[in-house]
């Protein structure tokens, strides 16, 4: 956080040394990539521009941080405290650098678990076509996906499925990975199913 005063040069040197130290670390099998942002804009605008770009960690350093040998750390998976304020944690610089690999791995796992939970919460099983029609007929702006049995039809049978889905503004989205062979009949054709697929609305 530059203040346009005599301390700025020392602060930039402190940050460049931090950047070099971080670049010597590795995480998740890759070298750590650290970018030093010296743009002359408000610190809040700069911070949120990096959050919006998906940076897993935003580091802010001011004069008091430098004097104490610290950095202020904002993790993408913990942006806010319980009181709604920004969760910026002051951390000794050397400890932060040494723990960078573990912190990035922890953030990756945390974001993965959050995304997995959100995905599962938005998938609903459906056992017949009437359930599909009823689900997407509801006044729901975020209907998510339906998990249905599928026989992989081809030719005219597939064309018929596509037309039925199109009438509800739906498409086949994907087949979940790691699924076991399901039992029962395809909800579209009545043939034995070979997998389960997700059906959703295309926007």
What are the functions of these language-model segments?
Residues 1-203:
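NTP/phosphate- and nucleic-acid-binding module
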